[in-house]
Amino acid sequence: AIRRRLLEGAPAVDYPEELIRYQQGMGRLSGGGLYRLSVDGGEGCAAAEYTDGESVLFKELLLSPDKMGRGLAALERVLPGARCYVRTPALWDGMKGSYLQPFGMIKWYSAEKRALWGEGTHGYMGLGFD
């Protein structure tokens, strides 16, 4: 419910409940999971997995851009790691010293649907199940 509300109106992949639960299980296997955040009155959510013994992959972090830094700091207290990778919609410039890297792609097999998408539109894949 939180995820859908935060992505409402954005071009994003909408996952059914069973896939969200699948992600929850995958996260737990590695020591992560699904998280609900409250930062300065703003609500958010995250899906995290440990990729190895010291790196955390936030497969999704949804929070308003002005609260991302504080949200990550709160998550780091629960999920410590030497390094973290964070996937967010294309609305956040990242942390100081970080770099941005596109994730996922879309290939249209229908010219009609491609025309509806619009040039320059940034979609959000989210969890990705990689």
Language model segments and positions:
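Active-site/acyl-donor-binding loops of N-acyltransferases
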Residues: E49-T51, K59-G69, A73-D130
